[in-house]
Amino acid sequence: MSNTTESSSYTSPPEIGDNAPDFNLADADLKMQKLSDYKGKPIVLAFFPAAESPVCTKEMCTFRDSLEELKGYDAQVLGISVDGPFANKIFTENRHLNFPILSDYNRETIMNYGIVMPNLGPLQGYNAAKRSIFVLDNAGKIRYKWISDNPLVEPNYEEIKNALAELKTSA
């Protein structure tokens, strides 16, 4: 399952069936989080352009509000932006987010995932994450991806739930 628009000029996004590139990112409490530490359960990687921006806030709050339902799929949500951990801490506290928000402040992870948005709105030269979703299976393989070149477009949350449901039934 894939709904991908125009690929990044930096590197190509990984394909469905590929192993998700590992990362080691700081959370809002400055604790390092490795993707590989979460193997053994489905993961929803939710990359977003900027903390506290309107669409990003709506998206992360939608994940917050549906977390109990997602736990029914034994899924872990990880939000990832290029914002620093201190900004992500304020975002997490202001929005009462109940899942880790990770900081890709050096932009290495968005480059490895091929989801660099080279100019965020009028901020020429400010590289942010394209709004993107990767659903990973228990082994860390990508089973669903969605990437948007338009930062104003939210993901289809039903597609994400359907991808998780497929993982649960195939387990």
Kindly label every feature range from the protein language model.
Residues M1-A171:
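Chalcogenol-based redox active-site neighborhoods
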